Design a protein with these regions (language model features):
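A conserved regulatory-domain signal marking ACT and ACT-like small-molecule sensing domains
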Residues: 1-176
């Protein structure tokens, strides 16, 4: 393979068995490789986000075949050229978990604190779980962070503690 090219491929549409197989088969038939992926069912919709690599010819094939496959399967499919991931040299990997009674604004409030300190959110997942005894909807946010090595962690922890205390949320922040 010559120089590697990269595409981010996203697909959203009604969930049904076989979608992952169909999409990964299309990528393989195009002569490309599926490197990184995130897939989930959100509501009744299947959502996919993948990093595909290959030579320029393969990337063109993924775009052409992907459009046809999306049409056939009723998926909104989008491709976008990108570059390979650069190693994060000046960042420390951390994980955060925030838990609280569900209400609008939790993701916004937490990520505003992180952005204000120059912290990059590398990945984020959230979900609702119901408390066993009360049945209360609990919101759980989990994220992988890239914290600038020059950032004073004590300041970040203090700000997160202040916000979480105001909102009655629990949080943990640890290396990883």
């Amino acid at each position: 393979m010559g120089n590697k090219s990269y595409l981010v491929l996203t697909a959203v549409g009604p969930d049904r068995p076989g979608l992952v197989s169909e999409i990964s088969s299309m990528v393989l038939a195009a002569g490309a490789n599926l490197e990184d992926s995130r897939m989930a069912i959100l509501g009744g919709e299947f959502a996919l986000l993948v990093l595909v690599s290959g030579d320029e010819r393969a990337m063109g094939e993924v775009e052409t075949r992907g459009a046809a496959l999306g049409e056939r399967l009723g998926l909104r499919l989008l491709t976008k050229a990108t570059t390979s991931r650069q190693a994060a040299r000046d960042f420390l990997p951390f994980q955060i978990r925030v838990t609280g009674v569900d209400r609008p604004g939790i993701v916004q409030r937490v990520t505003a604190v992180l952005a204000g300190r120059g912290v990059n959110v590398a990945s984020l997942e959230s979900r609702l779980e119901f408390a066993p005894e009360s049945g209360t909807a609990m919101f759980i946010l989990e994220a992988h962070l890239q914290i600038p090595s020059a950032l004073a962690l004590a300041d970040l922890r203090r700000e997160l503690s202040r916000v979480c205390e105001e909102e009655s949320w629990d949080y943990t922040l640890g290396e990883g």
